[in-house]
Amino acid sequence: AGWARVRVRGPEGARVLVEYCELPSDRELVPDIHPSKLKIRVEDPDYASFYDKSINIRQQNGYILKGKGTETFECRFAYMGFQFVRVTADPGVTVERVEAVPVHTDVAEAGRFVCSNDVVNRLQDMSRASLLNNFHSIPTDCPHREKQGWTADTYMTDQAAIYNFDMAAFYAKWVEDLAGTQDSAGGLCTVAPS
């Protein structure tokens, strides 16, 4: 989870659009990424796309150039869940560099698991990355769609999070968010904050 940092050059008023997705459909691949090079092929545009039809959203941000040499921009007021970025621009714009910027709540490492099996070690690394992708002041369900603090999602991952990271302050704050959802009968909402 994070955003793209894009370095461009072009005329004043020219526009740049940055779109994000987890996995583009075959029809959305750019010419230099052939479908045969992907480990997973996706032909169903409803499953993966720069446009998620199931919830009618696009993860995107844009920029209008000042036209004064090389300009660098990044969307710092929202984060996206993505593995792929598509950058399109008006004529006359040169895209010089695109860089992924990961963002998450700063939680210190509390533990680490390493063994002699490279596959298990890679699985552990991916699990840690997935956890960090969902730490954004609350434990979220996903970094690209709802971005909500669903209690069941947190229940399913809290032990893994605690083994890997110092979660005391993070979870204490989120439990306060959860307490804030309590109604007059004592019931709690399934999403916190809400």
Where are these regions (language model features)?
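Extracellular/oxidizing-compartment recognition motifs
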Residues: 1-145, 152-153, 169-174, 178, ...
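Short, charged/polar micro-motifs that form catalytic or ligand-binding hotspots
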Residues: 75, 147, 161-164
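Well-ordered alpha-helical scaffold segments within catalytic/enzyme domains
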Residues: 87, 156-167
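Generic alpha-helical structural context detector
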Residues: 159-162, 176, 180
